[in-house]
Amino acid sequence: MDIVEKYFTGLSERQLEQFQQLEGLYREWNEKINVISRKDIDALNVHHVLHSLAIAKVISFKAGTKVLDVGTGGGFPGIPLAIMFPEVDFFLVDSIGKKIKVVEGVAGALGLKNVIARQLRVETMKEKFDFIVSRAVTAFPAFVALTRKRIRENSFNDLSNGILYLKGGDFEEEIRDFKDKISVYNS
């Protein structure tokens, strides 16, 4: 897992071990339940792990922060972030049960005590979180409409509570109506 060490120094031995185990665990699970495309599994560390960790370049979550990962799929960005921030609580949700089974299996194998995974839709939730993370599960305006009531008002991190949304491509059209309310970070 040299690629993670290249961009994130100061990781503990435990974190390094967990990151090193990721590829093998996902390959094993992907044989049973296809959650990552067969051609993409070879680029897991760059396309999924590092992409997820881009959030850690924007914010270093403080201990006790509660993060909701919406549409987590196989556990991205939630699992890599949970390794990076072991004192932060991560709640990973997806509407597809087989994906949650993978998340539970990977989190369990890694010994991640800070991860809870559930099969449910975010619009049915009542709990509030400091941050909501996602990897572009829908158009940004629709995502905001689904999640905005799940964000706590009082912030204690260096960045105000809100949505951290990973998305590639041309995002300008989707965020046009939010220009005065958001910050865009490019990695």
Please give the residue ranges for each predicted region:
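N-terminal auxiliary segments of SAM/dcSAM-dependent transferases
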Residues: 1-38, 42
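Conserved SAM-binding loop of SAM-dependent methyltransferases across substrates and taxa
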Residues: 74-87
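S-adenosylmethionine
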Residues: 87, 91, 95-187
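Conserved class I S-adenosyl-L-methionine
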Residues: 63-73
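Residue-level signal for inorganic ion chemistry
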Residues: 26, 81, 167
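Conserved alpha-helix/loop element of class I SAM-dependent methyltransferases that forms part
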Residues: 28, 32, 45-63
